[in-house]
């Protein structure tokens, strides 16, 4: 089996099924800590339904957990641009930036995420 066939066969596997079936498959991969496989399924799903936050957020989380931090950051920025009060995306963006060593840039996102979640420091 040559490499081209293998790649085509692999791509077909990740794109197989309805959007709902692929969403379920991506969640199973993610729950099994198969983050790269989850991301492969989710890329196509996000392209198909770009307006939905759930698949894009799970894609960002899969990228984060598989150390694809620039990709995670890009997906998270799309989410917070569309929905500035999406606190979990803000939290993940802050953590992603921290993990890249960009602590100053992460700070505002982490503070905003905490405020949106109702986590206020005690005076």
Language-model-derived ranges and their functions:
Residues 1-18, 22:
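Long, contiguous interaction/recruitment modules in multidomain scaffold/adaptor proteins
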Residues 87, 91-121:
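TPR/TPR-like (Sel1-like) alpha-helical repeat modules
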Residues 15-48:
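Alpha-helical segment of the N-proximal tetratricopeptide repeat
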Residues 32-40, 66-78, 100-112:
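Structural signature of tandem alpha-helical TPR/SEL1-like repeats
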Residues 14, 48, 82, 115-120:
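Structural marker of alpha-solenoid helical repeat scaffolds
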């Amino acid at each position: 089996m040559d490499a081209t066939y293998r790649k085509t066969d692999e791509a077909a596997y990740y794109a197989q099924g309805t959007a709902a079936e692929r969403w379920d498959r991506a969640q199973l991969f993610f729950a099994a800590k198969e983050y790269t496989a989850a991301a492969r399924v989710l890329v196509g799903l996000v392209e198909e339904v770009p307006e939905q936050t759930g698949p894009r957020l799970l894609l960002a989380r899969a990228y984060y957990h598989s150390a694809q931090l620039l990709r995670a950051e890009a997906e998270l920025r799309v989410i917070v641009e569309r929905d500035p009060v999406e606190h979990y995306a803000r939290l993940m963006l802050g953590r992603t930036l921290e993990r890249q060593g960009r602590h100053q840039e992460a700070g505002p996102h982490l503070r905003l995420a905490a405020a949106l979640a109702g986590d206020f420091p005690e005076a």
